[in-house]
Amino acid sequence: MPSLKDLRNRIASVKATQKITKAMQMVASAKLRRAQLAAEAARPYAERMDEVLASLASIVGTGPDAPKLLAGNGYDRTHLLVVCTAERGLCGGFNASIARLARDTAEKLIAEGKKVKILCVGKKGYDLLKRQFGEQILELIELRSVRTIGFVNAEAIGRKILNLYKDAEFDVCTLFFAKFRTVLHQIPTAQQLIPLAVKTQEDAPAAPPSLYEYEPSEEQILATLLPRNITIQVLRALLENAASEQGARMSAMDNASRNAGEMIKKQTLKYNRSRQAMITKELIEIISGAEAL
């Protein structure tokens, strides 16, 4: 049975941990609001880009003369998986869920005889995947020093993806991230970037079709928009990830604070019972000694 001193030290240790988890919860809560607003602001632009590209793709088609970023290079042998996770932990299963989706996808592709290459954005994804896919990981892109995710960060990643594609390093590129829904709900998502996954009529929401007139030609517009779309989709993924990370961290730290509170109650109860038993024992010894006299 632990001594009173051990119980006091244990209670003090848990209380110190609870202070840290509460502070982290408050910081995550403050960051969440900004990250959520940024993610929500990026969605309409990315969705409208999808609509315009879908309209252009329906006109141009995916024949041999179509842009490679739209129709692909005709092969499906090498896949690039761009895995976006956080730089830090203590955010529940946020990083693990994205890494798990990427791992399952990689294992399925390898089982089909495909070659897999991985580009990790965020150290935690790299840490989770390096043991199994160390040889397939091309590079780790860290954003630890970035205070606010912006277009410049996404543009650098998008440029790297495009350069790898121009160098024929892969045939298909898929982006992995977590879509933010609520503080308690983040959805691990795999989005194909190259070739462009154009929404079909069944996928599109029921709405009257929009009529567009394009100047210059559709092919010229596609040649400009397709590389930019890579950057836009990467930016959207990074912003969704940032909001999802803070939401997951806030929830995880809230649960940790609650668990610490429960542990403090249990240890305090155990401490009081031990102290009461010790006092009772001492009283019995005093009374027994008095009766002996």
UniProtKB/Swiss-Prot annotation:
Q: Which CDD domains match?
A: F1-ATPase_gamma
Membrane topology, as annotated, equals: Peripheral membrane protein
Per the annotation, which location comes first and is thus the protein's main one? membrane
Q: Which GO terms describe its cellular component?
A: plasma membrane; proton-transporting ATP synthase complex
Extract the PROSITE patterns matched here: ATPASE_GAMMA
| Record keyword Kinase present | no
- At the top level, the lineage of the source is Bacteria
Q: Which UniProt keywords apply?
A: ATP synthesis, Cell inner membrane, Cell membrane, CF(1), Hydrogen ion transport, Ion transport, Membrane, Transport
Q: Which GO terms describe its biological process?
A: proton motive force-driven plasma membrane ATP synthesis
Which molecular function term from Gene Ontology is one that the record holds?
ATP binding
Q: Which family does it belong to?
A: Belongs to the ATPase gamma chain family.
- Could you give the subunit structure recorded for this chain? F-type ATPases have 2 components, CF(1) - the catalytic core - and CF(0) - the membrane proton channel. CF(1) has five subunits: alpha(3), beta(3), gamma(1), delta(1), epsilon(1). CF(0) has three main subunits: a, b and c.
User: Protein name, please?
Assistant: ATP synthase gamma chain
Query: In which organism is this protein found?
Result: Beijerinckia indica subsp. indica (strain ATCC 9039 / DSM 1715 / NCIMB 8712)
Gene name?
A: atpG
